[in-house]
Amino acid sequence: MATQIPSLSAPPGYRPQADDTGVETDLLCFYLLRQKTVAERLQMGAQLTRSARQFALNCFHQRFAQLTPRQFARKIAEAWLQEHCPADYVPGGSEVSWIQDSIQLAVELHQIFVAEDIPYYVTGGVAAIAYGESRTTQDLDVVLFVSRAVVPALASALEQAGFYVPGVDDVVSGRMRTLQVTQVDTISRADLIIADDTVYEQQKLARRQAYRLTNETSIYLASPEDLVVNKLRWGQQSQSQKQWRDVLGVLKAQQESLDYEYMHRWAPEFDLAAVLEQATVEAGVREIADRQWATAIYPTIHHAFEIAQARNRTTQPSPNLEIADGNLYTLTRDRAAQTLTVVAKTDDRDIARYDSQGTVLMASPSRQDRQQWREIAARIQ
């Protein structure tokens, strides 16, 4: 039976994932991705990585047919690990093990972290695949919540499991915060990042999400909202188009399931408010984000109107209209239309409208509106 595809349209500002991808094709691809589970999207990414590695092996066999098996193994390690390839490292295993993907590596590391009682979450490219667009990824990024004092014990457990673990002393001393480990038999690499001791890092740990990949194994992923904020931070530092594409992919694939208010609360902490707003426009989810804001702020708006009434600070220019005129915003209740409208006084702009039950009819807040209503909420609580 053929899949029924609904009518798909893009709002103004929508941006496809690539310059050579049409808007209609992009919309269709993400509609289909939204039908997949996290586990299914991870499997799609894993298959892409395995296929890419197998293709690379075939090409290298043709290009370097003169090499001995040991030389060939070293050549593959240098190509795949690049600057992270350890000196004199020659992969063990076989070509079958060399095409292992980062998702399988995450499963194997999960078992070690559980045995060592180390809380963690997977972030980076693997998490972006889980929540967004399928792509290949070179390594696995994992954030660990562990004291530096126990890093030697963790390194020992990793070495016993077949990992090459350099730089332990640098991490223990605080000179570095990342263990760059390589699984010897598979040429698979992971960055194990020691989490900072901050409120936001603890928030991310509390919000991590467990996903079952097999009947017996789960892995922890960063929440999609935290992944978006982190990738915006990384992209801001590196000006990376890959990070931006990952952000758009997560927003397009997750849409209504995301907590945009959470992202908008944290974005200003890292000077990301403008780029987050831009991302919601290019991903076609700005209206969803705006409506979430309007829903979340409605109790504050309703309470502000009640305060104005209690203080006799409303006016009634007609029997059906009651207006609370504040310093920054005007709240107008229309009994005939059964609506409550919020207007920004600086530019006479409607930013939200509700029906009599508080259901959002329209929402179009600016970044300044979001900030000002956060401050209003703090004052009148």
Briefly describe each language-model feature range.
Residues 1-19, 187, 194, 209-216:
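Intrinsically disordered, low-complexity linker/tail regions enriched in Pro/Ser/Thr
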Residues 2-97:
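N-terminus-biased detector of the onset of the functional/mature region
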Residues 190-192, 327-333, 341, 352-354:
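Broad, structure-driven detector of short, well-ordered beta-strand segments within folded domains
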